[in-house]
Amino acid sequence: MDVKLIEQAIKGNQDACVLLLQHHQDVLYRIAYSYLRNEPDTLDAIQEMTIRCLTRIHTLKEPTYFKTWLIRILLNVCADLNRKKQRTLPVLQEKGYEEEVHIDLYRALDELEVEQRELIYLKYFEDYQNKQIAEQLQLPEGTVKSRLHTILKKMRKRLGGV
């Protein structure tokens, strides 16, 4: 994304900020939906993230970290919504005759804690490298690797070694 546009947004240009949000809207929607698993909560999270972005963009110190900063805001909003509702995420609704393996995989993903699902999502759905995940989540890279290993081991056990 254009650093100059980000700098304009930091200086208070709301049109620039809106353009930046529009540029990232697809990935932000996918991330929110992967956590919240329903459309209304996803839209609420996106709306709250947008408000926080517009009111706090002036606090962004490094324009090159805009996307990371934005995703972190969204992850915090999603965590807030989950805590507020104090509920577990429902299993994805099956549509038609999906293969049993896919259904089992969705169930295994749903059984993970939000933080674990976040790691899996960033690694396998967004194709982030371990180093990028570590930066995004503010964790040591070794911690990311070990947590991913543990999560995958747990999922393999749940899926019966698939």
Predicted feature residues:
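N-terminal module of bacterial RNA polymerase sigma factors
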Residues: 1-26, 110, 157-162
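Internal acidic/polar
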Residues: 2, 80, 85-110, 129
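Short, charged helix-capping/linker segments at alpha-helix termini
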Residues: 10-19, 29-48, 136, 141, ...
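C-terminal flanking helix
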Residues: 25, 29, 50, 113, ...
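Structural recognition of an alpha-helix C-terminal capping motif at a helix-to-coil junction
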Residues: 30, 44-51, 55, 64-76
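Arg/Lys-rich amphipathic alpha helix in sigma70-family domain 2
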Residues: 55-62, 72-91
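DNA-recognition helix of helix-turn-helix
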Residues: 79, 131, 137-162
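A short pre-motif secondary-structure segment
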Residues: 119-123
